[in-house]
UniProtKB/Swiss-Prot annotation:
Protein S19 forms a complex with S13 that binds strongly to the 16S ribosomal RNA. One of its GO terms (molecular function) is structural constituent of ribosome. The keyword Cytoplasm does not apply. InterPro entries: Ribosomal_uS19, Ribosomal_uS19_bac-type, Ribosomal_uS19_CS, Ribosomal_uS19_SF. Keywords: Ribonucleoprotein, Ribosomal protein, RNA-binding, rRNA-binding. Belongs to the universal ribosomal protein uS19 family. GO terms for cellular component: cytoplasm; small ribosomal subunit. NCBIfam families: rpsS_bact. It comes from the Bacteria. This is Small ribosomal subunit protein uS19. PANTHER family: RIBOSOMAL PROTEIN S19P FAMILY MEMBER (PTHR11880), SMALL RIBOSOMAL SUBUNIT PROTEIN US19M (PTHR11880:SF8). SUPFAM superfamilies: Ribosomal protein S19 (SSF54570). Gene3D superfamilies: 30s Ribosomal Protein S19, Chain A.
């Protein structure tokens, strides 16, 4: 179910403070965050945010098309190694 419009988008305050500080100082370094649940706001466009996927921080460059989505959508947590090959097909 979608979030109610009257509540507005959710963004962790510590992430918002980091983005504002980076904007004011014109800093281009990636902002490291564990907040996968935060919604991408128009203020984030053009910034690189390193989102934690459970193991490492994955750098995500935010574009206009990403506004309204969650940060966790762009940092995959699972790696698919492929199904086991059929032994009969190898012969």
């Amino acid at each position: 179910m979608a979030r109610s419009i009257k509540k507005g988008p959710f963004v962790d305050l510590h992430l918002l403070k980091k983005v504002d500080a980076a904007r004011s100082s014109n800093d281009k370094r990636p902002i490291k965050t564990w907040s996968r649940r935060s919604t991408i706001l128009p203020d984030f466009v053009g910034m690189t945010i390193a989102v934690h996927n459970g193991r490492t921080h994955v750098p995500v460059y935010v574009t206009e098309n990403m506004v309204g989505h969650k940060l966790g959508e762009f940092s995959l947590t699972r790696t698919f190694k492929g199904h086991a090959a059929d032994k009969k097909a190898k012969r």
